[in-house]
Amino acid sequence: MHTSDISMTQDQDVSTCRLCHHNTDPNSLNIFDDTVQFCKDVSIAEVSKSLWSVQYDRNECLSELICSRCLEILEEAFELRKGMQEREQSLQEQLKEMIKDHPKHRPGLNGNPGVFVPEEGCIIVEVDPENLAESSEEEFALGSDGEYENYDDDDEEEEEDYDEEDEEDGQNGEDVDMPLGMDAAQMAAQQSVANNANTTEARPKRAFLCQYCDLGFTLPAECQEHELAAHDPNAPYCCNFCNIKLVTRPALISHIKTLHDPDRPYVCAHCRKGFVRRSDLKKHTIVHTGVRPFTCNVCSKSFSRNTNLTKHMRIHSGVKPFVCQQCPRSFQTAVEMMRHTRSHGEVKAFQCGRCPYSFSRRDKLIAHQQVHTRRDMEQQQQMGLIPPMEGDLQQQALQAKQKAAAQTKNSRYYHCDVCDRTFQRERDLQRHQALHMDSLFACKTCNQGFNRREQLQRHELEAHGPSFTCGICCISFLHQIELENHLKVHQLQHKMAQRAQEAAILPLKMAEKAPVAMTAPLVQDPQLVRPSAAELSFYSNMIPTMNLGFYSETRPEE
């Protein structure tokens, strides 16, 4: 083919429509340079690509024009797509309005669909999407002014939960002591890949909490089934102390603070442990579900919180980021550093009776006194006053003396006689000592043993059910103290009914005693207010069903 023929063919191709390859008119538009009215600021080539996914490349040998027929088809397709998107968006908004009040689709903490509506007092924290780790206490403290005033107590509770995770469930990985000269990477290489995979697959990955009682589940279906079956849609919030049902969460918290526990109104549904804030209760509930998504890559031990994993990793790395401002000592956790800082300003009130040394803490004094005891025993053995003792017997003698000194009156610190751990409360020491025993708490029904009181209570509730029943409303409870608290509500209702009857009868008695010609209005006692007809009907129907003899306050005649 000659050059003139190639030029003729090229001119003919350039003058045709790029979309349909038909001839174009002189008023045709350029698909790369021109824009249309129905889609401004976007070229025709980009509109065609978004509709039909066809990429048009610019080349001097190819046409850049579009005919009027293809332009009309392009406009119709664009308007059709735009209308479909608007109609679908409108349907989705109508669907949200229809299902937002249904219990199954209420927004909550368990992954239910719906529009998130923050509750009263809710703290919204912006989180980096690339670092979706669990927030620490310090991050939440920045968003509230008065909620985190007791910082020391919060840290101690967080440290206590960390110890509870570390002690209660240690089968994920054994405690590994890092040899000298070996870093974390070499230690991780020695771990078994198969054991790590089995441990990761055995544990659930996520916890789902009930939006009404914060009960934890590992499956969303179980959580939704619990919300529909265990909670009344009209009054879904139930008190864990007296089983009274309320409509809103603020009403429930006000009820608990007024009648039951003003300091810790948020109660765990598993073990009845109380918390100051609901965020602490949520973190504690995850421990009961067994969900531990944060795993140590050195010893394969897993944790339910990222903050606890960070503290645990400092054991392997040896990093102590918290440094005392008054001395060169450093610590792995903020709780240890704060406890040490208090020792600088405190008066050393614990004086050793055998030397001039004094200490600010009782446990330090006890550890110091053990040095004197050990020296006395060595001197007596050298002088032949007592026979030499075995190493285990000496250790047992020191542990017995330590335990006796720790449990004296007004003692603030309690020591474990097995592993030398120290606790500030005696109940924490008892709960820790249960881990060293086979079974400390036994079920009275089936004699099954448990290491913790919370496990025994959970077993009694799930296996045997409640055993104390109210004789008035037939509500059952697991413990007698719960029944007694519940009966106080009936007693209060009974007193209110008596006052209502007295207020209704008093005007009639006063009218009978007054003269007939007396026209002055009757003056009632301001403390006795006449109830409405609905209240009188309610109390009159309720009083015959009550066991009034149980609430009788009259003493028998002598």
UniProtKB/Swiss-Prot annotation:
Segments passing through the bilayer: none
Other noteworthy facts: Piragua means small boat in Spanish and refers to the small number of mutant embryos that have a hole in the dorsal aspect of the cuticle and thus resemble such a vessel.
A matching Pfam family: zf-C2H2_6
One CC-aspect GO term: nucleus
Protein name: Zinc finger protein piragua
Biological process, per Gene Ontology: dorsal closure; head involution; regulation of DNA-templated transcription
Domain ZAD: 15-94
Annotated region described as Disordered, given as residue ranges: 132-178
Natural source organism: Drosophila melanogaster
Annotated signal sequence range: none
Binding-site residues for Zn(2+), renumbered to this chain: 17, 20, 67, 70
Keyword Zinc attached: yes
Phenotype of gene-disrupted mutants: No visible phenotype. No effect on cuticle pigmentation, bristle and hair distribution and size, shape of tergites and sternites, size and constitution of eyes and wings, or fertility and survival of males and females.
Bias type Acidic residues, positions: 132-177
Zinc finger (C2H2-type): 208-231, 237-260, 266-288, 294-316, 322-344, 350-372, 414-436, 441-464, 468-490
Domain of life: Eukaryota
GO molecular function: DNA-binding transcription factor activity, RNA polymerase II-specific; RNA polymerase II cis-regulatory region sequence-specific DNA binding; zinc ion binding
